[in-house]
Amino acid sequence: MKAAITATANYLPPDILSNHDLELMLDTNDEWIRSRTGIGERRILKDPTKATSYMCGEVARQLLEKRQLAATDIELIIVATITPDMPFPATACLVQDLIGAKNAWAFDLNAACSGFLYALNTAIRFVESGAHKKVMVIGADKMSSIIDYTDRATAILFGDGAGGVLVEPAADDSCGVLDVRLYSDGTNGRERLLMTGGGSRYPASHETVDKKMHYIYQDGRQVFKAAVTAMADVATEIMQRNNLTADDVAYLVPHQANQRIIDAIAERMGVDRAKVVSNVGYYGNTTAGTIPICLAELDANNKLKHGDNLVLVSFGAGYTWGGIYVKWQ
């Protein structure tokens, strides 16, 4: 039995943080940001009473409506996030409560920007095994909650947002999720993209707050090089394993980290730029949210048709990375 994506949805907060807004906060300007990242604006969940679970709940309700399902039909909810409402309980459990999915079990998955692909793979295995028939997968992050807005290196990159899919048995074995390749590298990744404060190694204290250890840190140059290589390599591997040429691919859907990274991947793969999905200019890097947000936008604009070959690729902290081949049903 194959598993397929049967519905998509996304949620972007209404408030916009533009490059011009950042000019008032940082030593930067619109041209500098656009030339290095391709980002012009990003969405921010400003309401202090709303957290990641709120965005997930908005996505979950849309998914149910699109498939005309009751919340009680859902058997499993997986939320990929690095910005949970709190360390525990899992944000997925909060989502289960928000939508009334009383028959579902729920858990969070942390693989940073690769989180959605990791979570999607997990859902696929539950469906392929016959254990479940209706699994909800959501990637969401309120990155503004862990960004130091005095740090130009990170403040310009990230935004808030969520996207999700329903995974169900495919209508037939010719469509659905046809291949998955996932990887990790803790040796090279552990010190280059991280947030050190707040865990069991450095519990929250006056010292961790004073040292800004509760904000994200990244070695931008090293992460850039690693991301381009990893995503291009895994996309090529997926294509070779499935005898796909660049002409066969309807859309390459990469993690939306930086337009320069996206362009470099496309160039290395030889894929027509018209087939490379990009919305980073409008939303920035929403971490686990980027790929499902892209899928939902393609779907909403009627750009996905039966039999389309999609290659999804991502790279994130860990390092973690991977690719998934979907033939749209």
Swiss-Prot record:
Q: Which residues form the active site?
A: 113, 255, 285
E.C. number(s) listed in UniProt: 2.3.1.180
**Listed HAMAP family:** FabH
For the region ACP-binding, give the residue spans: 256-260
Name the gene that codes for it: fabH
Record note on quaternary structure: Homodimer.
Q: Which family does it belong to?
A: Belongs to the thiolase-like superfamily. FabH family.
Q: Which GO terms describe its biological process?
A: fatty acid biosynthetic process; secondary metabolite biosynthetic process
Q: In which pathway does it act?
A: Lipid metabolism; fatty acid biosynthesis
The name of this protein is: Beta-ketoacyl-[acyl-carrier-protein] synthase III
User: Which GO MF terms are attached to this record?
Assistant: 3-oxoacyl-[acyl-carrier-protein] synthase activity; beta-ketoacyl-acyl-carrier-protein synthase III activity
| Keyword vocabulary terms for this entry | Acyltransferase, Cytoplasm, Fatty acid biosynthesis, Fatty acid metabolism, Lipid biosynthesis, Lipid metabolism, Multifunctional enzyme, Transferase
What is its biological role? Catalyzes the condensation reaction of fatty acid synthesis by the addition to an acyl acceptor of two carbons from malonyl-ACP. Catalyzes the first condensation reaction which initiates fatty acid synthesis and may therefore play a role in governing the total rate of fatty acid production. Possesses both acetoacetyl-ACP synthase and acetyl transacylase activities. Its substrate specificity determines the biosynthesis of branched-chain and/or straight-chain of fatty acids.
Q: Which reaction does it catalyse?
A: malonyl-[ACP] + acetyl-CoA + H(+) = 3-oxobutanoyl-[ACP] + CO2 + CoA
Description of its domains: The last Arg residue of the ACP-binding site is essential for the weak association between ACP/AcpP and FabH.
Q: Which GO terms describe its cellular component?
A: cytoplasm
Q: Name one Pfam family in it.
A: ACP_syn_III
Localization in the cell? Cytoplasm
